[in-house]
Each structure stands twice: as C-alpha cells, then as structure tokens.
Amino acid sequence: HLLYTEKLLQEVLLGLHSMCKGADAQFFNGHTNIPSSRFLVFGVKGMLSAAKNVRNAMLFNVLSFMSDKLLTVGNTVAALDELYIWLSNPTAIEYIRNCLKRVRKKESAMLLASQNLEDFDQEQVREMTKPLFSIPPHQFLFNAGSIDKRSYMEMLQLDEAEYNLIKFPQRGVCLYKCGNERYLLEVHLSLIHI
C-alpha cells in the first residue's frame, strides 16, 4: 500500500517546482554571495508581496538560522526590526518568545524593534505578545506617539511617573528600563565613531 497519495505527491512536486524554477525561485533558489557570517542583514521588505505561505516559509528560514546562531553557536546578537511582519503568525510569535527566554544562557541577545505598539495589541495576538515586553532585561522606550496612554502604560508595564518622562516627543530621549532600575537617557550621535 502507498505511503503517500498521488495528490499529496503532486502538491509536493508543484511546490518544489515553484521554489526551484517557478515564481518563488527568486526567494529560494539562489546561492549566497556573503563571504562571512559575522554580520548579516536579511531584508524582508520584498517578502511582503509574496504569498502568505511563501512569506511564512521564508520567515521561518530566517528564524531557524537566527536560532542556530543565537542558541547553538552563542555569543551572537540578532535584531528583528519591523516586528509587525512576524506578528501575523502565532507560531513565529511563540518561536521569538521562546528564543528571548533562552538567549542569555548562551551569551546572546535579541533586539526587537517596532514603530507601532498597536500591532502588538490586536485581539488575535494580544495574549501571545504580552510576554515579549516582560522578558527582555533591557528596554528603551520612546514617546508613545498617538497611542492611547492607558494602553501604552499597560502593555509596557509603566507607572504614571515613568510615562510622564517620555510623554512628549523629544529627539533622542528615551526611558531605559533595566530590571527595577529606570534611567532617562538622551542619546546623541558622535561623529567621532562614524
């Protein structure tokens, strides 16, 4: 008796063809031109126009690569900018959350960045994204912009005094949270290091 149905095998072959020679080959069928893996940037902007299943596959490839570097190799820093891209997939959120919990044991760090806190407060992901704000030992919090004050304070676990420090937009000013300590930072660009 057959282990796989003919229909399933046909779907697999069509998927492989698409990834190797078809429409998705631009994402999956290429050789790297990166001679060193000391500093890598995966630009995900082009993925936004891909089909959801292709986008999810590519995001998981990136997550798997990052996870290996962070948790197996260690002594690595990974940054996920434009985090909203990952929030449409509950499995990706869980993957990121679990990675955040374990990276410090391997002398690694994970940076999460997003311009819009409201992306984390959507009904379908709210409970899953809440821990993303309580796990990191270091947080740099900037002015909330137009987001509701109470939502901002609740999501980031801020009291009134902490919120008031960053209530108004000020270039380079942020609240730095490190454990139970709080610092108001003013960040300046030093031309010496450029």
What is the predicted role of each segment?
Residues 1-108, 112, 124, 165, ...:
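P-loop NTPase motor domains
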Residues 91, 95-188:
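Conserved ATP-driven motor cores of ASCE-family P-loop NTPases powering translocation/secretion/packaging/pilus
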Residues 192-194:
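Conserved small/polar residues in nucleotide/adenosyl-binding loops
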